[in-house]
Amino acid sequence: MKRLSTPYQIMMVIAMGFAVFYPTLYAEICLVDDYDAISYFFSQDTFSLKEIFFPQSAGGGYYRPLIGLSYLLDKQLWFLHERLMHFESVVAHTLNVLLVFYVCREAVNLHLKRRETWLPLAAALLFALHPIATESVNWISGRTDIMMGTFVLVSVLCLLRFIQGRSKILLAFAILSALTACLAKEAAFGYLIGLPLFALYRVDTVSTVENQGYFAWLRLFLVYYLCAFFVALLFGSYWLVLGIALVYLAHISYNKFDIENISVSAGRIVKYSGVLISVFAVSAGLFILLRRLAFTSSVSKIGQTFTLMLADINYTISLFLGAVGFYVKKFFIPLPLNFFILEIDPLYDFVGIAVLLLFCHLILSKKLPAIFSLLGLLLLLPALPFAFGTIAWTAYAERYIYLSSAFWIIAVCLWGGDWLGRNPARKRLVTMMVVIVCLFASGITFKRNIVWQNNVTLMRDTVTQTPQIRKLRNIYIKALLDKGMTDEAVKHYQLAATSLPSLAGDEQAALMVSGKLIVKGSNNEALQLYQDALLSTHFKSEPLLIATIKLLQAMQSVGTVPEQERKRLEGLSNKYSSLLDEIDHNK
């Protein structure tokens, strides 16, 4: 690995990335969001940049104009062809992988002060093959994370080169790229919050762990963790958990700064921090202004979420800690992969507490690995309110740590470089471990990409892991019907209708399944399904009544129907017509 030149390393990364994501090129349009988005842009005869950046619509949700712009370009270039759009996603992910390679190379040169050509290659391969990337790459609507990642990684690359004393134009370009990332996805504001961390970077700093010794640090960490653990377990007070974390931060701060020789000018720190904090404040203000110009009002779900957050702050802290613990675990142990995650195990709260205490160490460190770790955590912040399940279609999602994983991988590689500097004899062992991890990751990722190729396999996997959600069943039923698997669709519809609660407007599944049965000539089966669905809706569904009446009239017109059966069908038709008239009268 050490002798492999940069061009060969890049070719290896690209080749492995495309080999693993090759199945993505033949994936269908996902029934969740992708189909609706593509249909919407297909239906628009004309579209202007003003409509994308300033639509002036009411009930605005996400403000991500760059995504709309990408769909517009797809329409102009290749008529929104799904294979080419999937190819775009794979290429964009590969671009991010190359950016991780160059960012890690700059970080290694800056942090280790020596050339370690294999560390950037390891970082790029781990990011390229990490199973957590599959959702963002395969789901066309998930391109938001990839686009945001490109601009954020370009910003980091420019900042690292600026820190090494290169042109100040790089700083301006880094800020501009970070602002552009916010137009792809709001999570980029987490990166903007962390920008001042680069101003605090110091090469000669000594970490708290190194000051105290590893065993002394671990002992202190465990004491505070156990205190927080039992407070959360026995009393459920997460306010006290935060208090313990603050005491822990004060404790290690005293130990750190009591012996540390601060060699960097405080004026320089204040100067650059002030500049970057001002940039964040201005960019946040500009984003809010753009959003208000784009939408006449915001979707009610956003307000509902903030109301829930403030209603019980102790619960909010618990929910956020659990989410952080869940995502950090997903980075190290991504399995099982799931497209729809509504809730997580409450035990992740305790993982989140450990991450919170580690955060205290990271925030005091001015080393580059700590900065990258913190940036990965900060990129998670905007996704935490989604855990309430009121904004997005799923409360938790693997794609939320797509970019965080890049920062954490770089941090792990930098720490690994530190450790190998003290233990050079272990380099061969570490190299073998990286190769093994990459092989396992590539196998998992390739297999997951095959699942994503087909709506039936994707939704079957999702329903298997989350069987209690009715809307997932309905999407699965549609996928089955689109593939002509009517019998299996009927089976799953009947299972959902009898075992899962009905949703408002849930008649769509009944209409889809019955429509396919009618095409097959199974009119009696379709009629029975309509009647069961009408009963579950208390005969209040207008679309179901209309469809049932049409079916009854068609069945009456068949010449071979016995007279007695014809009268029965006519009676049902009259009954449902009366119910429909009653609904129209009450409108």
Can you name each region flagged by the protein language model?
Residues 249, 457-587:
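C-terminal luminal/periplasmic domains and tails of membrane-associated envelope-modifying transferases
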